[in-house]
């Protein structure tokens, strides 16, 4: 079944929790999405304080972590998409963290 044309309603994020191993997002329609933190290396390498410092983008369309320069859309979580950051980009980001 092709789901590319399905309109997503009431899928805005309402609450976000980032644990040691998973990212959990509660949606307005009552669902909860949980994905492995390994899907998002910047979150995986972040401190607990950095993970806790998030804000919703727009009316819950996504989540932004200002300390990590990380943005994740609800649509990508629903589609099961992992971070598409390259290994080289992640290495540069990690090296920049060490320099601080």
Question: Where on the chain are the PLM-derived regions?
Answer:
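Motif-centric detector for short Cys/His coordination patterns
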Residues: 1-100
